[in-house]
Curated annotation (Swiss-Prot):
Residues 1-91 form the GST N-terminal domain. The lineage of its organism: Eukaryota, Fungi, Dikarya, Ascomycota, Pezizomycotina. It catalyses: RX + glutathione = an S-substituted glutathione + a halide anion + H(+). The gene is aclG. This is Glutathione S-transferase aclG. Pathway: Mycotoxin biosynthesis.
Length: 221
């Protein structure tokens, strides 16, 4: 797909779990309405090495509006950060003050280092190796991460993860791995983390989130 002035968001055909991580930039696209187009690709294609060193999604292609230079961004957190730097001019999603930016950056980075990779490995084992013995350490590790998130959301007035008053990149980063679907898929009761449950309900009530979750399982079909 050639660049035509819209950000190209690279995704793969949706199956039961493949869309879970790439809904992050799709939700952001719905929230801030930047011009974009989805490109459903086959990650086995050699050309995709020019986009991602391991041919993974989400990734994106854009163009510098000043120099015209090609822009390639890969990994979900990097995609989110790039897109808010480019299109979220008032800092709604990335933070408006130094303190807000620090909180958003910290919680987003922490998800990237902790809950994100742990949840993805658990999905990998559950989806790809259903007959393999249960990887005991993974459930324990992910439940610890949910405990940390529960403690954060339990703080007075903490409606969202990084900031109290509104969702940010941190919430988009956590959402796929802390939404009700994920708990159900992994065979865990979200009611054991009541503040996460209420937070996820707030996220699910957002029209942009609802639209993406309705559409995502059909992408590429």
């Amino acid at each position: 797909m050639e660049y035509d002035g819209r950000v190209i968001l690279y995704i793969i055909k949706a199956d039961e779990t493949s869309y879970i991580n790439y809904i992050k930039p799709l939700i952001l696209a719905e929230e801030i309405q930047f011009p974009h187009v989805l490109s459903v690709i086959d990650t086995r294609d050699e050309w995709f090495y020019s986009i991602h060193p391991e041919r993974m999604v989400p990734s994106l292609k854009d163009q510098d509006p000043v120099t015209g230079e090609k822009v390639i961004v890969f990994e979900s957190t990097a995609c989110l950060q790039y897109l808010v730097d480019r299109f979220d001019t008032d800092g709604t999603w990335s933070g408006r003050t130094v303190a807000e930016k620090g909180a958003v950056l910290s919680w987003t980075a922490y998800q990237t280092a902790a809950l994100g990779p742990t949840a993805k490995y658990w999905l990998y084992f559950k989806r790809g190796y259903p007959t393999r013995a249960n990887p005991v350490q993974l459930p324990r590790t992910i439940e610890k991460q949910w405990d940390i998130l529960e403690k954060r959301l339990k703080e007075p007035g903490q409606q969202y993860i990084a900031l109290k008053d509104r969702p940010t990149l941190a919430d988009l980063s956590y959402f796929p791995f802390a939404m009700p679907w994920m708990f159900t898929f992994l065979g865990v009761d979200i009611k054991d983390w009541p503040h996460i449950q209420r937070w996820s309900e707030r996220m699910l009530s957002r029209p942009a989130v609802a639209r993406v979750l309705q559409r995502a399982p059909t992408l590429g079909h």
